[in-house]
Amino acid sequence: MAVMNDNKIVVYQVLTRLFGNTNTTNKPWGTIEENGVGKFADFTTKALEELKALGVTHIWFTGVLHHALTTDYTAYGISNDFPAVVKGRAGSPYAIKDYYTVNPDLADDPTQRLEEWEALIARTHQCGLKVIMDIVPNHVARRYESIAKPEGTRGFGEDDDTTVQYAVNNNFYYNPNEAFQLPEGIYGEYHEFPAKWTGNGARASKPDRNDWYETVKLNYGVRPDGTKDFVELPASFENEDTEAHYHFWADKTVPDTWRKFKDIALYWLGKGVDGFRYDMAEMVPVEFWSYLNSAIKHQNPKAFLLAEVYNPNEYRPYLHLGKMDYLYDKVQLYDTLRNIVTHGHSTDAIAPIQHNLADIAHRMLHFLENHDEQRIASPEFAGYAEKAKPAMTVSTFISESPVMLYFGQEVGEKAAEVAGFGSPSRTSIFDYIGVPAHQRWVNNKRFDGGQLSETERSLRNFYQRLLNLKVNGAYIDLHQYNRQHTEYYNDRVYSFARGNEDEQWVIVSNFSEHDHFGFDLQLPDYLLGSWFLNDGTYTLTDALYNEKHTTLQIANGKGRLRVDIAPLESLIFKISKLVDS
């Protein structure tokens, strides 16, 4: 298992093409000329320094790879894509067309697009930040065409036997003698023969419009009947390190797709990328991840590897056998916190999640927003950004795990625009569009928040304070104990402790929009014993704003902490000194 850092990892996901776009036209289905686009160059040293000051340690630059799009770059030797199999005008960042170069939209000079990306990598490193980019292993654009691949490299599908449905070294699955047909309701011109299976696994030559019809499924040596055409890992290898995994695969024959992706990952590591976010990782066999990740760690032991995995039953296999560093904590913590914020569900649901994940909690990435999820401030989620402050506090501090925010989240972006293919409530990843609240922070590329409202400025200040606060030590639930033993403590509040012998923290969040609460929070004797706290009175100060103070009374091994908490407030108390004993 990798130990990634000494401090909290804070990932900032940014849709690269939207970050520096200052155009406010926001015409539905607008072209790049009408609605504008951001560039690599927009990530200036000033912008990067501001992100670092926010508390960010890693930037996930989303949409860097050259994906299918509708803008014409034939003057630069790039073939046009067929609009019928491109979602939106700007295209999906997850329909990769060429893994060895980057999106020409993002370059001031498309002929220098790779060099401009390399310059941004260097600039990011100079500001003390790490660079993460996507790898999308499950599928590629319907018309994959790598014009930038290194000499001697073969592109996906170039050597496939298209007369058979499956062959172990084919990169795609085929329906021989059948032509691809566009889904019902999707119009335009596109020819593909024979038809390939669609990215989400749909096998029909005419997929449904809700299928991932703009992509094709990659073949990892899994036969159509689900059996595997490769060596499986011994179960004991969940306890082996990445070097043991690397040596395991050294003399094994693996499917061609595996080798191609290893070459791709090592290519980008060689360009200075610090790690990868793997799209839909659980749709690819865990053995492949052992093969790929052990090769990556062999080249760069500190590489950051984050996987989008949604099935809790797959968490441990993908961590221990697949050698991921971190996984999304979406269907448990995110979904639970969202239900508390949106629907007023009980906070009693939080503690069991941490209990069930106790052995891997530090490897579950927490977030409240990303490109797939609705914006907090949208009516579909919270309606206004401040309502999720307690959830963000819990998400950030409940464990040592990394936390992620999505650009614009820190200023309350609502994503209310009708962009085109994308719908309001999510910032569109498919369209040329502006991000209004974020643009007010960008302030004509001054990156100083000069156009933010006072409310937006205050929210960003909250995030900056939160993300720069270093809370260490083991997690101990206080909620269940106080639900049983503390008068006036209730399920609109959540409390927990973090700490060790050297530093101790008590964190309380109030999820109620309207109600103040007051109670004497009880700290159980086993907690006080583990912290070696003697009887007496201790002072506590809220470390978030340094304005609220309280005392912890310990007598006969039992502790009581007075808490008076306002609606949507979080108190992060650090136990500092013994007043008397």
Region locations from a protein language model:
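Short, acidic/polar
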Residues: 37-51, 253-269, 388-392
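Substrate-binding cleft/loops of secretory-pathway carbohydrate-active enzymes
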Residues: 141-151, 286-298, 309-341, 414-421
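N-terminal structural segment of carbohydrate-active enzymes
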Residues: 1-130, 138-149, 153-170, 176-188, ...
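C-terminal beta-sandwich/jelly-roll accessory domains of carbohydrate-active enzymes
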Residues: 512-581
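Active-site neighborhood of glycoside hydrolase catalytic domains
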Residues: 216-315
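The substrate-binding groove and active-site-proximal loops of carbohydrate-active enzymes
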Residues: 21-41, 95-114, 218, 235-257, ...
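Hydrophobic faces of well-ordered beta-strands that scaffold small-molecule active sites
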Residues: 10-12, 59-61, 131-133, 276, ...
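Loop/helix patches that line or flank the sugar-binding groove of alpha-linked glycan CAZymes
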Residues: 22, 69, 84, 311, ...
